[in-house]
Design a protein with these regions (language model features):
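ATP-dependent adenylation/nucleotidyltransferase module used to activate substrates
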Residues: 2-43, 50-78, 82, 87-263
């Protein structure tokens, strides 16, 4: 258990110092290794959090959260910053909200950058330079990131496996179904469940909401081909097509969120 107010670890539900409720998970922070040029996720109470597990050099605090910037977004960032297309192709680029980090150096994008952007010009240049936009260095950085954070990733994997096994133990195997939407989250979930239960023959149900992009349908078919042992079914309600329902009752809105309940 962790108290955010006192920044201490405890076994109690209430902090013995301030009395506030504690959290089950210890917070993490993102450190940066300038030598390896990758972020490292560390628990705030890790005694070795300032040491890079790859090169052993001293790291520094970067942010509380971070995500990788894929080459397509990186190209857009270059254009928004009036840089040469693919100028950052050989750099380690990450982001947290509207702040970007290029080789560990912070670059903030203001709201006015997006408000004044020439979207037609951006679309034209994105199309023009996309063929030269390589994943080569990006993949190298991601491989290095995985290596630097392998202990953290192993911990998360074991935690997820334990959760799945505990939940699955309450049901007969033939009643276990994986809901598959064709997105990254359901792909990761399917992978975790199959590996945790050591059962590649589990039932996967792809819910076609009639709103799917062609690429999603294509990916669902490709997923099915790549997992021949899985029982893969498609659920589609042909009686309620999204756009037809919109004509009858109007589109989903903040005050009437009918989409999820219907599909």
């Amino acid at each position: 258990m962790w108290c955010r107010n006192c920044n201490i670890e405890t076994n109690e539900k209430n902090c013995p110092i301030c009395g506030q409720f504690t959290e089950e998970d210890t917070p993490v922070e993102i450190m940066w290794c300038g030598e390896c040029n990758v972020p490292i996720i560390r628990s705030v109470n890790d005694a070795a959090r300032e040491i890079c597990p790859i090169c052993g050099r001293k790291t520094r605090h970067l942010s509380a959260d971070l995500r990788p910037v894929f080459p397509e977004e990186r190209l857009l960032l270059e254009l928004l910053l009036d840089k040469k297309p693919n100028e950052f192709a050989g750099k380690s680029v990450w982001a947290s909200n509207s702040r970007y980090y290029i080789d560990g150096k912070s670059v903030a994008l203001s709201a006015s950058t997006f408000q004044t952007a020439d979207t037609d010009m951006l679309a034209e240049k994105l199309s023009q330079y996309s063929s030269d936009n390589s994943y080569e260095y990006f993949n190298e950085i991601i491989d290095r990131f995985v290596l630097a954070n392998k202990d953290r990733l192993f911990l998360l994997k074991e935690e997820a496996f334990a959760f799945v096994r505990h939940a699955a133990a309450q049901f007969d195997e033939e009643r276990i179904v994986i809901s598959f939407s064709g997105g990254k989250d359901s792909t990761a979930t399917a992978d975790v469940v199959v590996k945790a239960l050591s059962n590649p023959s589990l039932v996967h149900i792809f819910g076609d909401t009639t709103l799917e992009f062609p690429s999603t349908i294509e990916y669902a078919h490709r997923f099915r081909e790549n997992h021949p042992q899985a029982i893969f079914e498609i659920a589609r309600n042909d009686e309620q097509v999204f756009y037809d329902v919109c004509e009858d009752i109007g589109p989903p809105a903040r005050m009437m969120r009918w989409c999820c309940s219907m599909f």
